[in-house]
């Protein structure tokens, strides 16, 4: 009987020990699971924070690129404007130089007879008149072309004068006809540059 009691007691202690080990194993497994879940959550949190940081960095990079592109566009526009200004200045200088180089002071033909000067003597303000009238050489060429439409087409420039009427001025040119002794064509050119023959056979 004593042996039976001793055996039951030993079995009871063995089962209790096994149950305790099982509970400890369960607790250990539970702790491992909780730790794994915590680590996984921490990893997700860290990954999320990293993604946010990466997105923020990407946003900064995009903003930086946009600023850089905007700065480059502004610089290119400034350079383009500067180039255009330089080109305009060059064109203005060339135009001014061309005007200066193309200006010809009024002059008489070789061995000129006083024909236009005799018909239309001018005693007014020559400087004021020339400021209103077109370029002398341009007006002379237009008058010569007009004179050659009547009679001989190789008339030679002789002399000029200026006619004034109500504050408006005209050039008066005379052209000698080499084929007709003592005959001249009288041509006027107004301030608009319009040439007109007033007498194709003026006799000196």
Curated annotation (Swiss-Prot):
Residues spanning the signal sequence: 1-17
One GO CC annotation: plasma membrane
Compositional bias annotation for Basic and acidic residues: 23-70
Location of the protein in the cell: Cell membrane
Covalent S-S links between cysteines: none
Main location: membrane
Highest rank taxon of the organism: Bacteria
Biased composition (Low complexity): 71-102
Membrane listed as a keyword: yes
Keywords per UniProt: Cell membrane, Lipoprotein, Membrane, Palmitate, Signal
Membrane topology of the entry: Lipid-anchor
Lipidated sites in chain (S-diacylglycerol cysteine): 18
Residues covered by region (Disordered): 17-102
Keyword field contains Signal: yes
Residues where lipid is bound covalently (N-palmitoyl cysteine): 18
Designated name of the protein: Uncharacterized lipoprotein SA2158
């Amino acid at each position: 009987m004593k042996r039976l009691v001793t055996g039951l007691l030993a079995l009871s202690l063995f089962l209790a020990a096994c149950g305790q080990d099982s509970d400890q194993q369960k607790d250990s497994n539970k702790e491992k699971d909780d730790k794994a879940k915590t680590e996984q959550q921490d990893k997700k949190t860290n990954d999320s924070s990293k993604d946010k940081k990466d997105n923020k960095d990407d946003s900064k990079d995009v903003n930086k690129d946009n600023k850089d592109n905007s700065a480059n566009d502004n610089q290119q526009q400034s350079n383009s404007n500067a180039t255009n200004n330089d080109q305009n200045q060059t064109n203005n200088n060339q135009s001014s130089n061309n005007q200066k180089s193309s200006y010809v002071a009024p002059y008489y033909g070789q061995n000129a007879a006083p024909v236009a000067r005799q018909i239309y003597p001018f005693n007014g303000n020559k400087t004021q008149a020339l400021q209103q009238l077109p370029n002398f050489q341009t007006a002379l060429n237009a008058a010569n072309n007009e004179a050659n439409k009547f009679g001989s087409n190789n008339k030679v420039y002789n002399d000029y004068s200026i006619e004034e009427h109500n504050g408006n001025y005209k050039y008066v040119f005379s052209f000698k006809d080499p084929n007709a002794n003592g005959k001249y064509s009288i041509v006027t050119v107004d301030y608009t540059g319009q040439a007109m023959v007033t007498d194709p056979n003026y006799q000196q």
